[in-house]
């Protein structure tokens, strides 16, 4: 992803890396990536690398740096982060113990923060979405606000990860945000809270169309999504709009489970790892909506596991895609726990069932529809009966005749 598209959910809400460089999917670093569920402990093989230079730098700093209180822990973490940064991969990164715990908290749907997602656009930190009922919404923050300062510190030059690390914090503490909105400068004092957020929300339109929004592909997504179909696909309700807009991704397995609700057999995605080895993931064949008409909504912030889902559904001819081109994150990361911290490392690229790579290219919808304003996007949790300004959702319903 381009550096100018970093998204992170403040664990604060916090979701970062979604992490990575550019849609920092939650402290997750700059964009929540597609994570595999396994956590592997790794013993490094013997290497011909000479580590004496690192040792000499460390010792010289400790002995001669003008400020004698340089922390050995800080230097070690900096060295680890620098080693990973040298890969030039925006989705690989070293996480401190606190950062790793924050990432895991987000995917569990429980975390402390303000309840907002941010995106890095060029040199600006922009609020992408505000979660209903959270401190961010209560304070009056709005999607599209540009964060110019946090606790008096300018955000100029910040990445999404930087924003996450400054805004998130313990429940009960306060953070001050300065934002620019329509040429005006506004200030907000926001008290962080513990937030429990479901990954799925639903609404039924005209007693015919089930609208399902997936906010992220976390540990509870498959169960919540299956329950949503079970509870609502009955009687005259037989068509579906699947909304993946602003969804930064998450677990590959969760995406596979969602795909399996619509595709009865075949491949969901292909993971290509080191050396070109391919792992073909298959659908489970136990879905509830194999024959239901389906439209999928995408936008420029749909990434990672969202794109895996949309790509598979498209390749299998199960749905029409509506919206604008997706983010374009075609890699998979895995967490390798360390003695102190975690290594979030790219271990594969993924392809759609038809062997298409969307990395840096994104997925182009069948029907391109833009929103005049980000705030026009339908908010199922806030105004379930008002979607009049959401031209993308309106187009999806029109395609279904709903």
What positions do the PLM features span?
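Terminal targeting/pro-maturation regions of precursor/exported proteins
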Residues: 2-91
């Amino acid at each position: 992803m381009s550096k100018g598209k970093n998204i992170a959910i403040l664990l604060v809400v916090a979701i970062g890396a979604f992490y990575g460089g550019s849609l920092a999917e939650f402290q997750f670093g700059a964009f929540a990536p597609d994570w595999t569920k396994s956590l592997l402990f790794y013993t490094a093989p013997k290497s011909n690398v000479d580590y004496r230079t690192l040792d000499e730098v460390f010792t010289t700093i400790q002995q001669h740096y003008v400020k004698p209180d340089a922390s050995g822990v800080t230097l070690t973490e900096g060295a680890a982060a620098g080693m990973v940064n040298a890969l030039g991969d925006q989705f690989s990164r070293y996480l401190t113990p606190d950062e790793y715990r924050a990432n895991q908290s987000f995917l569990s749907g429980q975390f402390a923060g303000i309840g907002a997602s941010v995106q890095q656009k060029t040199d600006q930190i922009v609020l992408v979405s505000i979660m209903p009922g959270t401190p961010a919404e209560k304070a009056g923050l709005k999607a599209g606000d540009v964060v110019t300062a946090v606790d008096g510190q300018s955000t100029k030059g910040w990445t999404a990860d930087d924003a996450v690390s400054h805004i998130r914090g313990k429940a009960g503490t306060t953070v001050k945000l300065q934002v620019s909105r329509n040429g005006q400068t506004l200030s907000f004092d926001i008290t962080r809270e513990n937030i429990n957020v479901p990954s799925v929300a639903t609404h039924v339109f005209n007693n015919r169309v089930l609208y399902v929004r997936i906010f992220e592909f976390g540990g509870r997504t498959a169960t919540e999504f299956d329950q949503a179909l079970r509870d609502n696909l009955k009687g005259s309700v037989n068509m579906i709009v699947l909304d993946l807009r602003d969804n930064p991704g998450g677990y590959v397995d969760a995406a596979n489970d969602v795909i399996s609700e619509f595709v009865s057999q075949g491949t969901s995605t292909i993971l290509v790892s080191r050396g070109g080895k391919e792992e073909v993931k298959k659908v489970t064949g136990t879905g509830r909506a194999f024959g239901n008409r389906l439209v999928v909504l995408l936008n420029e912030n749909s990434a990672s596991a969202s794109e895996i889902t949309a790509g598979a559904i498209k390749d299998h001819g199960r749905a029409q895609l509506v919206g604008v081109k997706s983010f374009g994150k075609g890699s998979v990361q895995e967490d390798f726990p360390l003695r102190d911290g975690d290594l979030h490392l790219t271990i594969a690229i993924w392809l759609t069932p038809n062997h298409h790579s969307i990395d840096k290219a994104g997925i182009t919808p069948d029907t391109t529809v833009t929103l005049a304003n980000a705030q026009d996007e339908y908010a199922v949790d806030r105004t379930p009966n008002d979607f009049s300004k959401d031209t993308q959702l309106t187009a999806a319903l029109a395609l279904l005749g709903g």
